[in-house]
Amino acid sequence: MRALIDSHSHLDAGEFDADRDEAIARARAAGVLAQVLPSVAAADWPALHALTTRQRGLYPAYGLHPVYLDQHARAHLDDLQHWLDAHPQTVAVGECGLDFHLSDLDPGLQRMYFDAQLDIALQRGLPVILHARRALDEVLAALRRRPGLRGVVHSFSGSAQQARQLWDLGFLIGIGGPVTYPRAQRLRGIVAGMPIEFLLLETDSPDQPDSDWRGQRNEPSRLPRIVAEVAALRCADTGHLADATAANARRLFALPDDRV
């Protein structure tokens, strides 16, 4: 069985409280042997740590998500630094970023948390997991100011030019359920022709289900559907795509090889 890696799963979310262990088992049965779990708020960090300690193949990232701005306090940035110091098994800082789609999120506050988390990641040599909705140009500008920073823009929804600018900076893009919808023509075109070394696959569970799972809670076991779609778009072998994207995730997040 090919070892798939879900590079972005919120398996710690409340939607999985009733069947989290079963969801993990279904993922493993589907070949998803590793998952990267980014957090969204400081209150989530202890439970995420407990989950990733208890279950093999789950790797934590800690950060402050822009959509949950009302749950953050400036002190959480200091807390994040202390938390990272105390938890060396952390694979990334995130999920963090900018969201200019939701009008009730203060842009200035978002920028403050975002910039601080980029600096924290850069200082520690950790990659970042980025949320960028209607904010990619500003995110790109922030990344250019921090040469050497590594990471991924998850659920990429930008233009081909923005994708190339990310690749020029060494950043990867995360692709999930949206690519399975025929209406996503721009995204599908980018994925079809992009350099494979910059591609990560994700489910963003419990959100963003694929077209065959529309309206249902998404979960990591759906990742093979993403693999199949992307392989078809690229006229590529699914096994080769699975191996290449898993290798990309292991390289970015310094994950062990879970095929053994």
Positions of PLM-derived features:
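Mid-domain alpha/beta scaffold segments of enzyme catalytic cores
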Residues: 1-260
